[in-house]
Each structure stands twice: as structure tokens, then as C-alpha cells.
Amino acid sequence: MGPRALITMGHLLADTVIEQHRRRLKGRAVRITIDLDPTDDPTHGQQEFTFFNGHYDTWCYLPIVATVTFDDEPAQYAVTAVLRPGNAPAKRGALGLLRRLFTTLRAAFPTAILRVRLDGGFASNPLFAFLEAAGVEYVVGMPGNVRLDKRIQRLMGQARMRAKATGATAQLYGDTRYAAKTWSRKRRIVMKAEVVRHPGRVPKNNPRFVVTNLADTPPAVYALYCQRGDMENRLKELHHGLEMDRTSCSRFLANQLRVLLTLAAYILFQELQRRAQGTVCADAQVTTLRERLIKLAVWVERSVRRIVLHLPSAFPWLRTWRHLACAVGATS
């Protein structure tokens, strides 16, 4: 399968997910949040474009995964997964991926506000300029530096005094206007001054910074940013539930196909998770759904006109299986 076919396949998967939720919500989402996150895919052979990554301390690929969240729903729906070389910067491919998602989402949800959440590896002037030109909200992590450390110094002092007085972890918030030397203009930086205290340990300073164009209070902005942490659970499901890291083919494009097949399977499982509300599998992760609903002994009967699957008449999760089968369109 060549590059064009793989690109088309990736676009179709994203379009399918977005169209599915357009029908579910009737195009009435108020806000759609896009999360991007890279993840390491360790390699153990001579695959094309596998490189050593110092951050993860291993030879790997570095795929990037995108999810969308509608309004205040807890679910993050996977829409895109792109395989990248192991030494790729976090932001490689991000602008093209976001550009297409913006176009597709706006066509499906014309009145929705788009919001992007990213970690500090993506922070750069080209990214901020792109997001501002696209007219979207953004909350992006920002690595600390000498200048930002000076801006947060007073807050950190106050947090240390509070932590000492209470004997517990202390957090204080503030904001400032800041521009790095490579930035075209100043932007709002939300600061969190945190002093972490654990019994028997020396208190630890934990300053954090977030770049945003939102007008919300600093605590509210930082709370929005922290919600992206649930993305780690999506990555764990892809890795441990569906083995997205089985990219052992020697050719890079073949491994991209494997990643897309894993994404397609995950999209199906996420739909099962959504349809499982009201059952014992309502909060089940992919691994549990596989064990309870997919790993069944089936007798296959084939005739000239049809193929019949004879399922077991009794097994522990029969009622849940029937509920989900009917929810996705099966008839008895």
C-alpha cells in the first residue's frame, strides 16, 4: 500500500468518526476540544526510520495520536494516528493534521468553538500563529526558562510560606504577558506555583506554565489544561489493549498501515464503550471488552446463500453481549 492510499485511509477514519458524532449530536456541539499527544513505540529490529530517542531512552517510532471531545462529555474519541520517525520533534506533522481537522469539524459543526490542548513539546511561535490565524482557542504547556522563573518567583515564595504554615502541598496561580525571543508578539502565560510536601521528604518546588488565548481565571485555565492528562489512558488502551506498538515490519509504510488498522479497531471499541452505558461493561476498558465480548467460541456454518455464526447459548456475559449487539443494529 502506497503513501496516497494510506493518507486516504487515515482521512476516511477521521471523517467516519466525525460524521458519526455529527449524526449523534445533530451538529449541535457548542465546543469541540482537540488533544494531540506523541507516544513512544519501542522498536527492536532494523525497521525503516527507527531512531534513538533521548527522552524515552530507547530506539523507537514516535506516533502522534489525535482525539476529539464534544462539550463536557468525558470521552475522548480517537480520530487520527500518524506514525513518525523516532527522532521526530513533537510538533512534526501537527499543523497539517490540525488544519484538516479544523476543516472537517467546521463542516460538520459550523457553530462549534474549536479548542486545542497540547503539551509543552508543541510550544512554538509558528504553532501559536497558526492557531490564532485559524481562530481557535488554545491551551498549550510551556517549558520553564530563566525569564519565566523570575516572573513566578514571588508566587513561589508565597506558596512556600503557605506550605510551611499548613504542612500540606500549596498551589497558587497567576498570569503574565510574555514573549520569547523567537515569538512575534507577547502572549498570556498562566503560572502555577506549587510546593509539593510529602511526609518525611524535603518540600519540592513545582512551577508550571501554560500559554493560552483564553480569558478565564488562571485556576480555570490550568484546570482545563490538566484535563488533557486523560489522554494517557487513551494511549494505554491503544498500546496495552490493542497493541498499537506491533510495528515490526521492515518497511515504514507497512507499519503505518498497522497503526491505522489499530486505530480502526479502537474506533470500533470506543463505539462499543459508548453503547455499553447501562450495562456491567459501562466503564470497561478495551482489554475487558475483548475478554468479555470478543473472545467467544463460535461455530461457523456456510451455505451457498449465507454465512451463519452459531454463538454459545450460555456464557457469563451473554446479556451484555445481546444488549450491545442490538444497540449496534443486530436483530434476533
Residue ranges, per PLM feature:
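Short, conserved catalytic/metal-binding motifs centered on acidic residues
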Residues: 1, 32-40, 76, 114-123, ...
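Active-site-proximal, Lys/Arg-enriched surface segment
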Residues: 1-69
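Short acidic, glycine/serine/threonine-rich loops at helix termini
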Residues: 43-50, 78-80, 125-131, 150-155
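Electropositive, glycine- and tryptophan-enriched low-complexity nucleic-acid-binding patches
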Residues: 54-109
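Domain-level cores of phosphate- or acyl-group-handling catalytic modules
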Residues: 88-147
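An anionic, glycine-rich sequence signature occurring as long contiguous blocks
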Residues: 137-240, 323, 327-332
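Short amphipathic alpha-helical "interface-anchor" segments enriched in bulky aromatics
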Residues: 218-257, 261, 265-272
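A short, flexible helix-boundary coil/loop motif
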Residues: 265-332
